[in-house]
């Protein structure tokens, strides 16, 4: 696999921040810095970086740190302009000479680090992927906030005055939420503590209900997006809208992940060789995208319960002496391969255009 230095003539390394981006133009042949600039994080600043790159003719690539965070806007702008953009999620950091640290230095390091690599990731792009990521983040936040509030409500019930606590005795947490949402604090106006507890319990319960409704609304939007972008995913055994959305946001678009082995590594489903001498063994992969790994785990568990072919496979592997945990790891690797091949296969023009628009 050739290094980036063999494919381009200049690399523009960019150190991204909230208000400014600092860029350094570095030649591929010598690694020399030929120009640097700091621009604001707006359309004018993005265009200034394009003009900076255009002043140095020849094949070029942009190397961005934080293309999924502060550099997201710039990455979109560059992609729309047809520029080659590579993502540096965890750039190698050499020892700083005399403690040197600045945005221009980091931009130069980003460019030189990109030049030395043989494997470079492309930023996640596409409006459909971005929309899914937004809905998924909001849904996850709503679910977590609802769970936190439920725990707080349960704890408050336990320490509440006996007349209040008696209303919830024998109820599950979910039933407590329903009961608390219907409380009428003014009925305990003569008791300051009871009135306050009833008031807070009702507010907490209504907050939980609101957050649940939000999460449900986001899930419906996610399902509609997945169905319009990649309906073929939903036809796979064990793949629902949330699992499909998790897979799509990690994969992003065709060609971003260069092979099914790389996709398995991204998902943390590829075993790590740990052999020595005559001993051949593999170590569990605990890296990668853990949300994607969880999605594969969900698919594997669902298929083990409901899919006859998967259950037959598990029985065969048990007969060979494999443990249930080892069988699940094997299944996740096979599922990663199946998903990758499906995602990289051609789609209808309408579905492809949805994320390319």
Which positions does each model-derived feature cover?
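Short glycine-rich, Thr/Ser-proximal phosphate-binding strand/loop in the N-terminal lobe
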Residues: 18-44
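Short glycine-rich phosphate-binding loop at a beta-alpha junction
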Residues: 58-70
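Gly/Thr-rich phosphate-binding beta-strand-loop-beta motif of the actin/hexokinase/Hsp70
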Residues: 2-27, 110, 142
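Short, basic/hydrophobic alpha-helical segments
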Residues: 44-61
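Low-complexity, acidic/Ser/Thr- and charged residue-rich accessory regions of DNA metabolism proteins
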Residues: 277-278, 282, 314-357
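Phosphate-backbone recognition surface of nucleic-acid-processing proteins
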Residues: 102, 235, 241-320, 324
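Glycine-rich, often acidic, oxyanion-interacting loops/wings at catalytic, nucleic-acid
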Residues: 135-232, 356
């Amino acid at each position: 696999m050739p290094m980036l230095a063999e494919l381009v003539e200049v690399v523009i390394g960019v150190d991204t921040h909230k208000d400014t981006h600092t860029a350094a133009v570095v030649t591929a042949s010598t690694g020399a810095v030929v120009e640097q600039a700091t621009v604001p994080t707006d359309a004018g600043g993005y265009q200034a970086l394009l003009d900076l790159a255009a002043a140095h003719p020849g094949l070029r690539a942009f190397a961005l740190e934080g293309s999924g965070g502060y550099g997201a806007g710039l990455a979109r702008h560059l992609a729309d302009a047809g520029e080659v953009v590579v993502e540096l999620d965890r750039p190698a950091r050499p020892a700083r000479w005399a403690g040197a640290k600045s945005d221009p230095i980091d931009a130069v390091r980003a460019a030189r680090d990109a030049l030395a690599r043989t494997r470079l990731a492309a930023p996640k792009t596409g409006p459909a992927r971005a929309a899914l990521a937004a809905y998924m983040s909001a849904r996850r936040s709503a679910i977590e906030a609802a769970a936190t509030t439920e725990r707080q409500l349960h704890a408050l019930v336990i320490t509440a005055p006996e007349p209040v606590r008696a209303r919830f005795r024998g109820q599950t947490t979910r039933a407590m939420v329903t009961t608390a949402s219907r409380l009428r604090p003014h009925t305990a106006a003569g008791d300051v503590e009871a009135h306050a507890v009833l008031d807070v319990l009702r507010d907490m319960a209504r907050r939980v209900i609101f957050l649940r409704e939000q999460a449900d609304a986001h899930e419906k939007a996610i399902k509609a997006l997945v169905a319009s972008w990649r309906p073929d995913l939903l036809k796979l055994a064990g793949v629902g809208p949330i699992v499909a959305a998790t897979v799509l946001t990690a994969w992003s678009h065709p060609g971003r992940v260069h092979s099914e082995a790389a996709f398995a590594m991204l998902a943390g489903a590829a075993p790590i060789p740990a052999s020595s001498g005559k001993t051949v063994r593999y170590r569990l992969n605990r890296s990668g995208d853990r949300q994607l790994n969880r999605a594969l785990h969900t698919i594997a568990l669902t298929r083990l319960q409901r899919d006859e072919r998967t259950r037959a496979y598990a029985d065969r592997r048990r007969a060979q002496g494999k443990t249930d945990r080892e069988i699940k790891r094997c299944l996740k690797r096979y599922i990663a391969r199946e998903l990758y091949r499906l995602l990289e296969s051609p789609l209808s023009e309408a579905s492809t255009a949805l994320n390319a628009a």
